[in-house]
């Protein structure tokens, strides 16, 4: 950018169409967050009515993560083939329908299936909205685009907590899910009133449809084997998370089977760049493992361990959700200033100073707890707002929605494991200690994976001929693309 351009405030680099595109996607993601967290808010009520164990109740949160990988793949491919806008609308309709079904669920199995539908829609909304906004904004503002967008999910969680405190004590937990049908109206408006993403239009102008991940996996020469593997993965995940298996060894075997299937899909669809794709799934897996025990079980901790009433729970969750939302926006500024990976690492390191105090002070002072949660979530959870930008930079435009959707949502199975692991550890320790221990230890794994740019590093080790040296979204160098000790200018020389 020129000196004159740099002196212009960042928001003046955006035209009205770009702001409208962002606003529409942000509202869609807010509604996604609202619908998704409803189950966490009423988990104790649902557990009591259906007579569920703690692990079974936690599996209702996990259910939405089980189907996310498939939703991210299918709806991401839709976004790559037919445009980001159609994929966004379809995703909103899916998660809204699943939420309504939760309100009518007569028992555990029905609600579990409804949560599977929500997971598919949520996955599609994440991938399509993220690529839509990132590709609509200028390159030097794309960390902000990512961070601002993902803040909508946290705002949706805050709104849901406030609605919970007003609705559930009067009309019961089912009424909360009936409200979740409203996003369908918004989806109909989206279909007619927002433009297509600029990068996607430029890539596809006058060209034949791209060959998507769905084409490669389910219409190629290995389609029969891939369909069988898809069914096998779905069945294995069902048995792992539906509370039907008590044998840890069997669960481990099924988990390894799923991992092998997902790696196979990545090898087939990404070609020589499969090491990058696999490592991105690992990054996201640990990102969910460190953050989602708190996201999923914080309401339960507040209601059981701290004995807070619904109104106080809503107030504390407001601080938590608002902190995450602010953190997404702050992360966007940090990412454009420091660079995506450096901003991620610095924010997570700062969050580590707060995670132990959050669960050590108890519930005597609600305001102190709320403030600690605000800053911890701002630094620890909010920085995940730039994760779509980080992941998307490893994929070209014609594979970005499916690549982001699949890698992110396979890794998001960590979110399915997280509440169950937290609940299991809480059987031996108190819930607060379990949540703090998981988050504190696993955050360091994410710091290492992102700080060392392990996707690029492993790609260089295994398939260097397909190494990408620069971010496909903003053109900045990948630090892991050169060996330790190499000159920094090497990356500039190799930029295509």
Swiss-Prot record:
Bilayer topology annotation: Multi-pass membrane protein
Transmembrane segments: 22-42, 58-78, 92-112, 148-168, 170-190, 224-244, 247-267, 278-298, 313-333, 355-375, 406-426, 431-451
Species this chain originates from: Escherichia coli (strain K12)
Family, as annotated: Belongs to the major facilitator superfamily. Sialate:H(+) symporter (SHS) (TC 2.A.1.12) family.
Origin superkingdom: Bacteria
Keywords: Cell inner membrane, Cell membrane, Membrane, Sugar transport, Transmembrane, Transmembrane helix, Transport
Function: Catalyzes the proton-dependent transport of sialic acid. Can transport the common sialic acid N-acetylneuraminic acid (Neu5Ac) and the related sialic acids N-glycolylneuraminic acid (Neu5Gc) and 3-keto-3-deoxy-D-glycero-D-galactonononic acid (KDN). Functions as a bidirectional transporter in vitro.
PANTHER family reported in the protein's UniProt record: CARBOXYLIC ACID TRANSPORTER PROTEIN HOMOLOG (PTHR23508), SIALIC ACID TRANSPORTER NANT (PTHR23508:SF3)
Protein name, per record: Sialic acid transporter NanT
PROSITE patterns: MFS
High-level lineage: Bacteria, Pseudomonadati, Pseudomonadota, Gammaproteobacteria, Enterobacterales
Gene3D superfamilies: MFS general substrate transporter like domains
Entry's induction text: Negatively regulated by the transcriptional repressor NanR. Induced by N-acetylneuraminate, via inactivation of NanR.
Stretches of the chain found on the membrane's Cytoplasmic side: 1-21, 79-91, 169, 245-246, 299-312, 376-405, 452-496
Pfam families listed in its UniProt record: MFS_1
Compartment(s) of residence: Cell inner membrane
Gene knockout outcome: Deletion mutant is unable to grow in the presence of Neu5Ac, Neu5Gc or KDN.
GO cellular component, as recorded: plasma membrane
SUPFAM superfamilies named among the record's database cross-references: MFS general substrate transporter
Biological process annotations from GO: carboxylic acid transport; sialic acid transport
Catalytic activity: N-acetylneuraminate(in) + H(+)(in) = N-acetylneuraminate(out) + H(+)(out)
Stretches of the chain found on the membrane's Periplasmic side: 43-57, 113-147, 191-223, 268-277, 334-354, 427-430
């Amino acid at each position: 950018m020129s000196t004159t351009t740099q002196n212009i405030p960042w928001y003046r680099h955006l035209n009205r169409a770009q702001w409208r595109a962002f606003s529409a996607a942000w509202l869609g993601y807010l509604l996604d967050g609202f619908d998704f967290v409803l189950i966490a808010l009423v988990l104790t009520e649902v557990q009591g009515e259906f007579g569920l164990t703690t692990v079974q109740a936690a599996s209702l949160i996990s259910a939405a993560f089980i189907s996310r990988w498939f939703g991210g793949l299918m709806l991401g491919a839709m976004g790559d083939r037919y445009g980001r806008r159609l994929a966004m609308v379809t995703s909103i309709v899916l998660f809204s329908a699943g939420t309504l079904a939760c309100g009518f669920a007569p028992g555990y199995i029905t609600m579990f299936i409804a949560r599977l539908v929500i997971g598919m829609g949520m996955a599609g909304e994440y991938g399509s909205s993220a690529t839509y906004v990132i590709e609509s904004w200028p390159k030097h503002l794309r960390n902000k685009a990512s961070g601002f967008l993902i803040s909508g999910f946290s705002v949706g969680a805050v709104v849901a907590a406030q609605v919970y405190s007003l609705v559930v004590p009067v009309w019961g937990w089912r009424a909360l899910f009936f409200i979740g049908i409203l996003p369908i109206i918004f989806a109909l408006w989206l279909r007619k009133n927002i433009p297509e993403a600029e990068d996607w239009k430029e890539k596809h102008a006058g060209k034949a449809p791209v060959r998507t991940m769905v084409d490669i996996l389910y219409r190629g020469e290995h389609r029969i084997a891939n369909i069988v593997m898809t069914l096998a993965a779905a069945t294995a995940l069902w048995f792992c998370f539906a509370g039907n298996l008590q044998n840890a060894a069997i669960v481990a075997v099924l988990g390894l089977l799923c991992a092998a299937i997902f790696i196979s899909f990545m090898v087939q669809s990404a070609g020589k760049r499969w090491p990058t794709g696999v490592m991105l799934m690992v990054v996201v897996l640990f990102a969910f493992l460190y953050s989602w025990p708190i996201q999923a079980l914080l309401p339960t901790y507040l209601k059981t361990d701290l004995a807070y009433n619904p109104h106080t729970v809503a107030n504390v969750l407001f601080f938590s959700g608002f902190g995450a939302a602010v953190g997404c926006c702050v992360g966007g500024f940090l990412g454009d200033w420091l660079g995506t990976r450096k901003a991620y690492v610095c924010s997570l390191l700062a969050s580590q100073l707060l995670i132990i105090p959050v669960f050590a002070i108890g519930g005597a002072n609600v305001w102190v707890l709320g403030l600690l949660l605000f800053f911890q979530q701002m630094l620890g959870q909010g920085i995940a707002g730039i994760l779509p930008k980080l992941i998307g930079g490893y994929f070209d435009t014609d594979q970005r929605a499916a690549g982001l959707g699949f890698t992110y949502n396979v890794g998001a199975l960590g979110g399915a494991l997280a509440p169950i692991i937290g609940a299991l550890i809480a059987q031996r320790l108190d819930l607060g200690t379990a949540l703090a221990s998981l988050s504190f230890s696993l955050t360091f794994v994410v710091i290492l994976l992102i700080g060392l740019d392990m996707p690029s590093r492993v790609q260089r080790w295994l398939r260097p001929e397909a190494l990408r040296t620069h971010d496909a979204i903003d053109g900045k160098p990948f630090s892991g693309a050169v060996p330790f000790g190499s000159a920094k200018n090497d990356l500039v020389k190799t930029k295509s």
